[in-house]
C-alpha cells in the first residue's frame, strides 16, 4: 500500500505562483472578557453582566507563496502591542484591524482552522467599528475539509501531532490574563504562539490533508490551459484508456482520469458522445 504524500505545488508555474500570492493562511487570538458574578462554579452569564467585549489581540498571517518560499519567516503578526493606544487600552484593536484590512481585501482565499470563528470575529469587529468590510474572499476551512472523516479529535493541535508530528506551543489561561493587563512580555509570547499556529500547524496540516477531499479543495487548475488538470495540485491527469464511469440511472458513460501523484480519480463532466468531452471539464470522485 502506497503512502499518499503531502501536496506539492509547482510554483514554477506562473499561474500557481501568481495565485499563491492571494491565498492567505490566517489565525487570530481573541481577548478575555470580564463578567460580574456573585459566585464561582458553572452558571449562565447574561450579556448585562459583561463589563467589556471580545477584541482581537493578535493576528498571524502569511501568503501561500511566502510560506512556501520563506518557511516560518513568511508569517507576519499584527498585534495590539505596537499600537499607539496600547498603554491606555491593551485590548484596543482598531489599529490592528486597519492594518489587516488591505490583506483581507486583496485575498482571493483565506485558509483557517474552524474558519467561521476567525472570519466571524474579524468581520464582527469591522461592523462594530463602523468600518467598510473587505472585498469578498473564499474561505477554506481545514476543519470542515475533514468532515467526511471520523477522527478522535479534529482540534488543530491534535491534528498536527497525529498527522505531521508537530505540536503547538504550550499555553494556559494565565497568558490571556496577562495580556489583558497589558503585559508586554505576555503579548510577545502570544505573538510567538500565534505565528506557530500558522506555519507549524495550520499550513502543514493543509498540505498533509489537501488531497483527501478534492471536491472541497482550493482549485489550482488553470482555466486557460489545454491540459486536463487535477484541481488540487493544478497538474496533469492521465486518461484511463477503456475505463468509464456509468450512470446507473441513465446508462450514460463518462471517461475516467487519474492523478498519478495522488491516485485520485476524476470523471469527465460530459458523456463520451458529447462534443465537450475531453475538453478539460472534469469532476473528482468523492466518498
List each model region and its residues:
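Acidic, Mg2+-coordinating catalytic module of metal-dependent nucleases/exonucleases
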Residues: 112, 158-224
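Short metal-binding segments enriched for Cys and/or His
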Residues: 255-287
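Conserved DEDDh/DEDDy metal-dependent 3′-5′ exonuclease domain
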Residues: 70-158, 162
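Short, intrinsically disordered terminal segments enriched in charged and Pro/Gly residues
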Residues: 2-9, 212-220, 279-287
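Short linker/helix segments within small regulatory modules
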Residues: 243-257
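Short cysteine-rich clusters marking metal-coordination/redox-active sites
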Residues: 227-233, 247, 259-262, 274
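Cys/His-rich microdomains that often coordinate metals
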Residues: 234-241, 265-266, 283
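Conserved RNase H-like, two-metal-ion catalytic cores of nucleic-acid enzymes
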Residues: 2-104
Amino acid at each position: 500500500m502506497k503512502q499518499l504524500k503531502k501536496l506539492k505545488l509547482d510554483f514554477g508555474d506562473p499561474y500557481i505562483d501568481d495565485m499563491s500570492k492571494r491565498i492567505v493562511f490566517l489565525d487570530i487570538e481573541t481577548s478575555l472578557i470580564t463578567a460580574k458574578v456573585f459566585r464561582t462554579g458553572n452558571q449562565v452569564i447574561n450579556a448585562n453582566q459583561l463589563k467589556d467585549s471580545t477584541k482581537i489581540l493578535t493576528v498571524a498571517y502569511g501568503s501561500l507563496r511566502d510560506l512556501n518560499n520563506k518557511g516560518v519567516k513568511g508569517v507576519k503578526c499584527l498585534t495590539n502591542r505596537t499600537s499607539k493606544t496600547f498603554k491606555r487600552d491593551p485590548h484596543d484593536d482598531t489599529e490592528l484591524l486597519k492594518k489587516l484590512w488591505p490583506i483581507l481585501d486583496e485575498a482571493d482565499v483565506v485558509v483557517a482552522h474552524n474558519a467561521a470563528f476567525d472570519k466571524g470575529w474579524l468581520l464582527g469587529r469591522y461592523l462594530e467599528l463602523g468600518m467598510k468590510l473587505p472585498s469578498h474572499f473564499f474561505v477554506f476551512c481545514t476543519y470542515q475539509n475533514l468532515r467526511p472523516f471520523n477522527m478522535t479529535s479534529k482540534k488543530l493541535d491534535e491534528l498536527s501531532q497525529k498527522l505531521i508530528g508537530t505540536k503547538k506551543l504550550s499555553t494556559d489561561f494565565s497568558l490571556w490574563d496577562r495580556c489583558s493587563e497589558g503585559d508586554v512580555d505576555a503579548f510577545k509570547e502570544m505573538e510567538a504562539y500565534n505565528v506557530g499556529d500558522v506555519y507549524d500547524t495550520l499550513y502543514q496540516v493543509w498540505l498533509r490533508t489537501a488531497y483527501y477531499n478534492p471536491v472541497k479543495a482550493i482549485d489550482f487548475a488553470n482555466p486557460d490551459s489545454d491540459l486536463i488538470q487535477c484541481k488540487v495540485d493544478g497538474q496533469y491527469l492521465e486518461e484511463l484508456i477503456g475505463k468509464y464511469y456509468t450512470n446507473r440511472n441513465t446508462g450514460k458513460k463518462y471517461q475516467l482520469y487519474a492523478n498519478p501523484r495522488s491516485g485520485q480519480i476524476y470523471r469527465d463532466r460530459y458523456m463520451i458522445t458529447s462534443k465537450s468531452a475531453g475538453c478539460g471539464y472534469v469532476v473528482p470522485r468523492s466518498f
